[in-house]
Amino acid sequence: MGFRINTNVAALNAKANADLNSKSLDASLSRLSSGLRINSAADDASGMAIKDSLRSQANTLGQAISNGNDALGILQTADKAMDEQLKILDTIKTKATQAAQDGQSLKTRTMLQADINRLMEELDNIANTTSFNGKQLLSGNFINQEFQIGASSNQTVKASIGATQSSKIGLTRFETGSRISVGGEVQFTLKNYNGIDDFKFQKVVISTSVGTGLGALADEINKNADKTGVRATFTVETRGMGAVRAGATSDDFAINGVKIGKVDYKDGDANGALVSAINSVKDTTGVEASIDENGKLLLTSREGRGIKIEGNIGRGAFINPNMLENYGRLSLVKNDGKDILISGTNLSAIGFGTGNMISQASVSLRESKGQIDANVADAMGFNSANKGNILGGYSSVSAYMSSTGSGFSSGSGFSVGSGKNYSTGFANTIAISAASQLSAVYNVSAGSGFSSGSNLSQFATMKTSAGNTLGVKDETAGVTTLKGAMAVMDIAETAITNLDQIRADIGSVQNQVTSTINNITVTQVNVKAAESQIRDVDFAAESANYSKANILAQSGSYAMAQANSVQQNVLRLLQ
């Protein structure tokens, strides 16, 4: 080998290798101290880009999980609030059921209504105060609210919570047909009962026979109510226009074809002769008689078949001639507030024909709290009077009482007291025509007036002219009447269904959000694992690399020392 001293190639090679090994040792120490395989872009440029993308995705998924948990918190808050509202509605329905029996007096029903009013106030209070982070949840404004639950934009879930105030829930549809005076065979069909299909009921005969009438039709409708959502009730009542006065029926007096014969009865049917005679055959006729709180005769068909009075019941019963044949009124209830669409044949025989006046109303829970409007009351089937206009009637109805109080004068048209002269009471009949609107009962708007005479203690005249309106009266609030209590039961049931539907929707969204959170949690773990594979150092492998670099550093130092000492051998050649 040659000996050169100007250029120590061996030492230079040793130094170069030592420099490279020093860099490897530095990198290894950096990885071991940080725990990261990539500490700078120079370590792995493409790997750094991938791991940064994965880290961003993992962090975003973590926030998405937090968003989802916020959504769950909101939905659970609303759900628990509505659970309390449902308990309130259950109590309201229970109290309405308690009021729906004639063992209750007006006083006790009024107390029950007061309880219901308080419950409604609390229900509304819950609806108006339930909030999350200042956002109202049950007021109806929490609609189409979005929650980002993905790593990329617009990966959202939407949540809506319907309004739960008493004015927004319980919307129930009530429809009642006109009073029926002519029977016949009826084919009744509910149109689009589920939004698509029609439901055709079995044919029903409206008559006075057993197994016929509105009762039979109501049974047919109600046994399919779970499918159609429509329920039916009926009212078949014939009521006198005034308190019963002494009189007698004719020898051929009969109800629904069953002969009762002659009956002498007293004022108010004090001896019970008229009621007893009618009730003696009630199992055959299906008609039960009673005297109401105003002393009027009330005939009721419990089974829903018609009431047909034949012969002469006597003027003392004050039965309107137009009511001698009465098949009642049919009322329909639907628990969604939408119109009840019907079709069929001979619908006039159930009061729902083209020419019939049908009362219709949709009522919310809150509306049942106050006085029930006359139109709504009629739609609920409160009244048996029909809407219409008076076309003609008495030119005047006058009453006179002397200062001695001896009673009304003979020939006055109506009389009370000892005279009992009511022979001219029905000299004229009143004709009714259809009208689009109705007034409160007894509100005679035209040609009416009262005057008092100077020499008479009491004198009154009221003219009933053609064109005057006739209708039904407003009803008292909620459960203060039997019919009202029944209606509140229907409305409360609808409100419960409404809240259950809202809660079901919330539950569906909760399940959706929970599933999404579970999914993105797994995704986040997998993304972090992938990032770790790229970014984090393998301590076992890196420890081996460090040991190698450390040994090479030591051996390199020895080699460099030896390379420098080799040049000393040149001195021996110069000795």
From Swiss-Prot:
| Gene Ontology cellular component annotations, sorted alphabetically | bacterial-type flagellum; extracellular region
Query: Where does each sequence repeat begin and end?
Result: 405-409, 411-415, 447-450
Asked if the keyword Acetylation belongs to this entry, the reply reads no
Point out the signal peptide segment.
none
Give GO terms: molecular function aspect only: structural molecule activity
Q: Does the keyword Repeat apply?
A: yes
Classify the source by domain of life: Bacteria
Q: Which Pfam families match?
A: Flagellin_C (PF00700), Flagellin_IN (PF07196), Flagellin_N (PF00669)
Record key words, sorted: Bacterial flagellum, Repeat, Secreted
Task: Tell where it localizes.
Answer: Secreted; Bacterial flagellum
Indicate the principal place this protein occupies in or around the cell. secreted
* Function statement: Flagellin is the subunit protein which polymerizes to form the filaments of bacterial flagella.
The family assignment reads: Belongs to the bacterial flagellin family.
Q: What is the annotated quaternary arrangement, including any partners?
A: Heteromer of flaA and flaB.
Designated name of the protein: Flagellin A
Origin species: Campylobacter jejuni
Tell me the classification of the organism that encodes this protein.
Bacteria, Pseudomonadati, Campylobacterota, Epsilonproteobacteria, Campylobacterales
